């Protein structure tokens, strides 16, 4: 991932980098990988996430 710094504006470049990293899901993955997650817990978490995504799509379609 690459972010260019213009006019020595490091703050803006850092903000852009953080935005790109969050959109790519890197922060979320790092949070998950901090500690070992049992397979059963992982399956449960993924199922909950899938339900949330599905509900979100349904809300958008009904609006």
From Swiss-Prot:
Pfam families: Ribosomal_S21
Keyword Ribosomal protein: yes
Alphabetized InterPro entries for the sequence: Ribosomal_bS21, Ribosomal_bS21_sf
Gene Ontology molecular function, alphabetical: structural constituent of ribosome
One CC-aspect GO term: ribosome
GO biological process: translation
Keywords: Ribonucleoprotein, Ribosomal protein
HAMAP family for the chain: Ribosomal_bS21 (MF_00358)
Similarity comment: Belongs to the bacterial ribosomal protein bS21 family.
Protein name, per record: Small ribosomal subunit protein bS21
Species: Syntrophus aciditrophicus (strain SB)
Source taxonomy: Bacteria, Pseudomonadati, Thermodesulfobacteriota, Syntrophia, Syntrophales
């Amino acid at each position: 991932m690459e972010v260019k710094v213009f006019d020595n504006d490091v703050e803006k470049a850092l903000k852009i980098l953080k935005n790109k990293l969050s959109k790519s899901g890197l922060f979320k993955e790092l949070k998950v990988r901090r500690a070992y997650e049992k397979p059963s817990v992982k399956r449960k978490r993924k199922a909950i996430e899938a339900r949330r995504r599905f509900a979100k799509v349904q809300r958008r379609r009904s609006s």
